[in-house]
Each structure stands twice: as structure tokens, then as C-alpha cells.
């Protein structure tokens, strides 16, 4: 099994040596348990390496404008160096409008229009934590990503779309799948690597991939991931699962992004 936690520990150890204490403000809307757990992990990581983190919590039915005003307040706060809006947001809130309000220099997830534009042009400055985590795992396993066939089961702005651009820039051929993709197995069984990040248990099964495929489960549903039969998947593939896989590395990359935001201000 591929150990993403080991790579995360190496990165956090390097960050711990830095003589700086940047502050992260996290905006959490609603009672999604997976989101709350992920926020707790980010706070714990920040405190461990001498960074600072705080959470602004809001109820599920909050108006979009209130969230935008909270983002703008963080933009103006001189003691806040990075802002993270925990996704997903409730359906009444537009992610696009929220990230349009976020100051690019404080965007630790790389989701403002300016940062997304740079990623799409192949000039990323800040990548979403999960995207860089997956890239690092593939890099560790393969070195070069040229000519790699990758199937990504996720087409969100947080993971699937930026990941496809980053891997394409590295010379990989990427197939991006979404909830309406028919015959998913047709796309997964041809791949050298499969990344799944849907938050839906059982979306990817061992019989859907070839022997020796690299499989990265970046899904997060209360620490369980997208794959049910993990033991069989681990025997058949080079498997990076949940817990202990992409999740801890995603958190570590977020801390690295926070430091970069701090240095750029």
C-alpha cells in the first residue's frame, strides 16, 4: 500500500523548521461531518508546526452574502494570511461568487478566478491541496508522468479539473469522468492510474482496474473513502487508500500553501 502519510510527515517536518507563524482562517458552513473532520485535521496540523488557525462556523441556512462578507473581512484582516472556504457549500451559496470575493494573495486552495486561470494556462502558483497531493504520490511511484494513462473520477474545480490540467502539462493523457459517465469501467480498466474522489462508497471496485494499476482513493466520507474492498484492491494494485493516503498529504500541502501566501504578502 502506498503511504501518503509518510510523504505528509516529511513535508510537515520541513515546514516545522520555518521561522514563521502564518495564520489560517477557515470558513465552515453547515454540519457536514466529513468537512468538520477535515477542518479539525487542518487545525491540528497547523498547531503542530507552529502555525495558527481559526474557524468561523456558520449554520446551514446562512445567506450567500453573509459568507461573502466574512470572506471580505478576512481579506482586510492584517493578521490573517490565508483563507480557506471548506467545501462543499450548501446549494443556496455559489462557490463561484464566494471565490470571486476572495483575495488571491490569501487563497490557500488556488480556487480564485486568477489562480484557476493560471492553472489552466499551465502556470500554477497555488494548487488545491488534493491536486498537489495526488501529483506527489504519482511522482513518487513513477518519477516521470509522460505517456501515463490516467482516469480521474471527479470533475470538480477542487480536484478533477485542475488535476487533469496539471497531469496533462506533465505529459499524461487524462480521462475525466463525472456522475453521468456511462460504462465507467471502460475508462478505468484501460488506465495506468485511477484517481477517485467522489465521496461515494463503492464507486470503484477491484474488478474495474487492471493488475498493477496505481489507484489513489482521494474520496472522503468519514474516513472511509470511495473503495469498499480495500484488501483486494491492495493485493491487485499499487493502492493509496483512506485513511492514511491522500488525505494527510492534502492537509500538509495546505500548510505549505499557507506559508507561500504569507511570504507573498
Where are these regions (language model features)?
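Positively charged, low-complexity intrinsically disordered leader regions
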Residues: 1-20
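Conserved hydrophobic helix-helix packing surfaces used for dimerization/oligomerization
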Residues: 22-24, 150
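Glycine-rich phosphate/diphosphate-binding loop of Rossmann-like nucleotide-binding domains
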Residues: 29, 34-43, 125-210, 214, ...
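Short beta-strand elements in bilobed, periplasmic/extracellular small-molecule ligand-binding domains
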Residues: 46-60, 174-176
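Short, well-structured alpha-helical segments in soluble
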Residues: 66-78
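Short, high-confidence coil segments that cap the C-terminus of an alpha-helix
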Residues: 78-80, 191
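Anion-binding alpha/beta catalytic cores of soluble intermediary-metabolism enzymes, centered on
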Residues: 84-145, 202
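Rossmann-fold NAD(P)-binding glycine/threonine-rich loop
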Residues: 96-112, 116, 216-265
Amino acid at each position: 500500500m502506498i503511504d501518503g502519510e509518510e510523504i505528509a510527515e516529511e513535508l510537515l517536518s520541513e515546514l516545522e523548521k520555518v521561522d514563521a507563524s502564518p495564520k489560517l482562517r477557515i470558513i465552515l458552513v453547515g454540519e457536514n461531518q466529513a468537512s468538520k473532520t477535515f477542518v479539525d485535521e487542518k487545525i491540528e496540523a497547523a498547531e503542530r508546526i507552529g502555525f495558527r488557525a481559526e474557524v468561523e462556523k456558520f449554520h446551514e441556512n446562512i445567506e450567500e452574502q453573509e459568507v461573502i462578507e466574512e470572506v471580505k473581512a478576512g481579506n482586510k484582516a492584517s493578521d490573517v494570511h490565508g483563507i480557506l472556504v471548506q467545501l462543499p457549500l450548501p446549494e443556496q451559496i455559489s462557490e463561484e461568487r464566494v471565490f470571486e470575493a476572495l483575495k488571491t494573495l490569501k487563497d490557500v486552495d488556488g480556487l480564485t478566478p486568477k489562480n484557476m486561470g493560471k492553472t489552466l494556462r499551465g502556470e500554477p502558483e497555488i494548487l488545491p491541496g488534493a491536486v498537489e497531493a495526488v501529483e506527489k504520490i504519482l511522482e513518487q511511484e513513477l518519477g516521470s508522468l509522460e505517456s501515463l494513462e490516467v482516469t480521474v473520477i471527479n470533475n470538480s474545480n477542487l480536484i478533477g479539473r485542475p488535476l487533469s490540467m496539471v497531469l496533462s502539462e506533465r505529459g499524461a493523457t487524462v480521462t475525466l469522468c463525472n456522475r453521468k459517465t456511462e460504462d465507467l469501467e471502460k475508462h478505468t480498466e484501460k488506465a495506468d492510474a485511477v484517481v477517485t474522489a467522489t465521496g461515494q462508497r463503492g464507486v470503484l471496485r477491484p474488478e474495474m482496474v487492471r493488475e498493477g494499476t496505481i489507484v489513489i482513493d482521494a474520496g472522503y466520507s468519514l474516513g472511509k473513502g470511495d473503495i469498499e474492498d480495500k484488501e483486494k484492491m491492495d493485493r491487485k494494485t499499487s493502492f493509496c487508500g483512506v485513511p492514511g493516503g491522500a488525505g494527510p498529504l492534502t492537509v500538509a500541502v495546505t500548510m505549505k500553501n499557507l506559508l507561500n501566501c504569507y511570504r507573498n504578502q
